[in-house]
A protein has these predicted regions:
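Acidic, glycine/proline-rich low-complexity segments that act as flexible tails and inter-domain linkers
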Residues: 1-9, 15-43, 49-134, 163, ...
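Alpha-solenoid helical repeat scaffolds
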Residues: 20, 149-150
Length: 201
C-alpha cells in the first residue's frame, strides 16, 4: 500500500510546520484541491504543537489562514476537548507496545509532571481525538520528527505507525515525500533510523 495524494499533502504539511517553512505552507494551501483543507488538515495543524511547539503552530495557522483558510470546522471539532484518559492510555500502549512501561518510567525519572502532561495532554487530549486515523497521525509525527532530526522519537513513532496499521513502505514514503525539505544528512539519517526500527522482526 502506498500513500494517497491526500496523505502526501498531510505529511508535507506536518514537516513544513515543524521546520517553519512558511512559503511551503503557502504553496500547499494554494494548490490544495477542492475539498481541502479539511478536518484532516486541521488535525495535523492542531497536533503540531506537540512536535513543533506553540510558536510555530500559531504562525502556521496564521500563514494558512492568510493563504486561503483552513475550511469550515465540523461542529464536533469544536466540542470542548475533554481528555480521554482511557483512549490516551490505550493509544500509548499500542504505540510503545512492550516498551510502554519503560517509556513511562523514563519520563517519570526526568520529571513527574512531564510524564503526566504527556499522558493527559499529548495522548488523552490531542492524539486520541477523532478526525484523523491513528496511523495517519503517526505518519505525520514521523514527518515532523524526521524534519527536526529527533532520532529517538522518530524511531518510536516510526514503529508506532506500523503498530497502528501503516505499512513499512508508507513510513519510507513519508521520507521520500519530504526529502526536498530536509538536508541530505538529515534525510540519510532518517532513512537509516526508519530502516532499522521498522524492519521485520
Amino acid at each position: 500500500m502506498s500513500l494517497c495524494a491526500s496523505d502526501r499533502r498531510l505529511v508535507r504539511l506536518s514537516a513544513a510546520i515543524a521546520l517553519g517553512r512558511w512559503e511551503e505552507l503557502r504553496v500547499l494551501r494554494r494548490s490544495a484541491p477542492v475539498g481541502e483543507p479539511n478536518r484532516r488538515w486541521r488535525e495535523v495543524l492542531l497536533q503540531s504543537h506537540l512536535f513543533a511547539g506553540f510558536p510555530r503552530t500559531v504562525e502556521a495557522a496564521s500563514v494558512l489562514t492568510e493563504a486561503g483558510g483552513l475550511g469550515v470546522c465540523d461542529p464536533d471539532e469544536l466540542e470542548p476537548s475533554a481528555p480521554s484518559p482511557a483512549g490516551g492510555s490505550v493509544l500509548f500502549e499500542r504505540i510503545y507496545s512492550e516498551q510502554a512501561s519503560a517509556v513511562r518510567a523514563a519520563l517519570e525519572r526526568s520529571h513527574p509532571l512531564l510524564a503526566r502532561w504527556i499522558a493527559e495532554h499529548a495522548y488523552a487530549r490531542v492524539l486520541a481525538r477523532a478526525g484523523l486515523a491513528p496511523d495517519r497521525r503517526e505518519l505525520c509525527a514521523v514527518a515532523a520528527l524526521a524534519a527536526q532530526e529527533q532520532d529517538r522519537q522518530l524511531a518510536a513513532h516510526a514503529r508506532g505507525a506500523v503498530r497502528l496499521g501503516a505499512t513499512r513502505a508508507e513510513v519510507q514514503e513519508v521520507l521520500a515525500e519530504i526529502a526536498e525539505l530536509l538536508t541530505p544528512a538529515a534525510l540519510e539519517r532518517a532513512r537509516e533510523v526508519v530502516a532499522h526500527f521498522t524492519r521485520e522482526p
